[in-house]
């Protein structure tokens, strides 16, 4: 029996849930009231940061299985997360949180360029901008504030990575220990926004010694936060001095169907595992040794318009496993400057890494997003 809460009237989950409440997942007490009324046995936030503190809050109030509210709250607030990193011996960029544009503008001398400006409480790179000069700092701050529910932004020095792709994906924690290392390459499209994820691929292109450093960092973080179970979405980089820098860590599964991709790689149902953990049930899923060469790509447009169709090249069609469209002809399409403007997603399986790299590095040649003018 599944109860779903959301403030969006068009949430597609309402058609498969047993009960739907038009309640915002950020309204902790309203969700608690629903949970009490329905006498739920577990509560789970999925694929988005804002609902995660609510799930932990309700879990603690009703004495249900949950990760500590204080830990979840740290992970969902970027300035608190940066403070946690600094206080616990992890690498953290020079950063500062602000509640007004004026305060941030007056404090730029604190930082070395490039910097990244972003809301403290958003995910999917919504509201984030990288600045290589201070010329457009006002625009970047206004953009970041427009995506912050708490009306608070963070400015931090931007860490340059030594490897080709940001390290991302999901890990799965059971009894405090990471049991699935779903680390993936994070792909970007610099034509639209170098910060917004456009896809993931596996296997991870990283030296084994660096993989070990990443794993040690994440397990240590789970220990210090007291994270006991569930999916944790991660983003990290390693700099030229071989230092691991955690960029974002979210106490929930990743968006863009990351659990589905990891399911193919590990032969395990990570969604089922997350639900079982949240219910306090034993996890009986068999997790296989990771195998294969897989990728996802978020279908997107470089401009605004009216959706007509998306055409794939014959070469790409050889490797397509699944295609999911979110738009239909006639729908309005916006330039892909944040993850919410995705047009759909495709899953691919390749025979080897070389083939995957060849296709994934030239996706604009293999996908034709056809629009009509507005």
Describe the function of each predicted region.
Residues 91-93, 114-117, 129-165, 194, ...:
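Conserved ATP-binding module of the ATP-grasp superfamily
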Residues 60-127:
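A conserved helix-loop-beta module that forms one wall/lid of the active-site cleft
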Residues 129, 157, 203, 263, ...:
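Short, well-ordered beta-strand elements within core beta-sheets of diverse protein domains
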Residues 1-71, 102, 280-284, 301, ...:
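ATP-binding N-terminal substructure of ATP-dependent carboxylate-amine bond-forming enzymes
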Residues 98, 128-133, 172-174, 239:
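Short beta-strand-to-turn element immediately C-terminal to the catalytic PLP-Schiff-base lysine
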Residues 129, 139-144, 156, 165-187, ...:
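Beta-strand scaffold of nucleotide-dependent catalytic cores
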């Amino acid at each position: 029996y599944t109860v779903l809460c959301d403030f969006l009237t068009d949430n597609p989950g309402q058609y498969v849930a047993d009960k739907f409440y038009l309640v915002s997942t950020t309204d902790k007490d309203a969700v608690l009231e629903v949970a009490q009324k329905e006498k739920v046995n577990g509560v789970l936030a999925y694929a988005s940061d804002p609902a995660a503190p609510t799930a932990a809050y309700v879990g603690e109030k009703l004495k249900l299985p949950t990760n500590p509210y204080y830990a979840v709250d740290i992970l969902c607030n970027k300035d608190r997360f940066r403070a946690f990193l600094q206080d616990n011996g992890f690498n953290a960029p020079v950063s500062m949180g602000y509640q007004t544009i004026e305060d941030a503008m007056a404090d730029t001398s604190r930082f070395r360029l490039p910097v990244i400006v972003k809301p403290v409480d958003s995910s999917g790179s919504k509201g984030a901008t990288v600045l290589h000069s201070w010329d457009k700092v006002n625009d970047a701050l206004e953009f970041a504030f427009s995506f912050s529910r708490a009306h608070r932004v963070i400015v931090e020095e931007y860490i340059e990575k030594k490897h080709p792709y940001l390290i991302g994906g999901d890990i799965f924690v059971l009894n405090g220990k990471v049991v699935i290392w779903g680390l993936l390459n994070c792909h970007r499209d610099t034509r639209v926004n170098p910060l917004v994820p456009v896809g993931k691929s596996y296997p991870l292109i990283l030296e084994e010694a660096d993989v070990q450093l990443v794993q040690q960092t994440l397990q240590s973080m789970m220990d210090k936060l007291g994270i006991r179970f569930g999916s944790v979405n991660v983003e990290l980089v390693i700099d030229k001095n071989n230092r691991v820098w955690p960029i974002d860590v979210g106490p929930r599964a990743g968006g863009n169907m990351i659990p589905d991709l990891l399911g193919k790689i590990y032969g395990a149902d990570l969604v089922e595992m997350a639900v079982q953990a949240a219910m306090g049930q034993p996890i009986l899923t068999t997790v296989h040794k990771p195998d294969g060469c897989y990728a996802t790509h978020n279908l997107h447009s470089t401009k605004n318009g009216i959706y007509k169709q998306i055409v794939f090249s014959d070469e790409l069609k050889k490797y397509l496993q699944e295609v999911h469209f979110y738009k239909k002809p006639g729908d309005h399409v916006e330039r892909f400057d944040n993850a919410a403007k995705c047009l759909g997603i495709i899953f691919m399986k390749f025979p080897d890494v070389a083939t995957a790299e060849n296709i994934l590095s030239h996706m604009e040649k293999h996908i034709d997003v056809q629009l009509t003018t507005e």
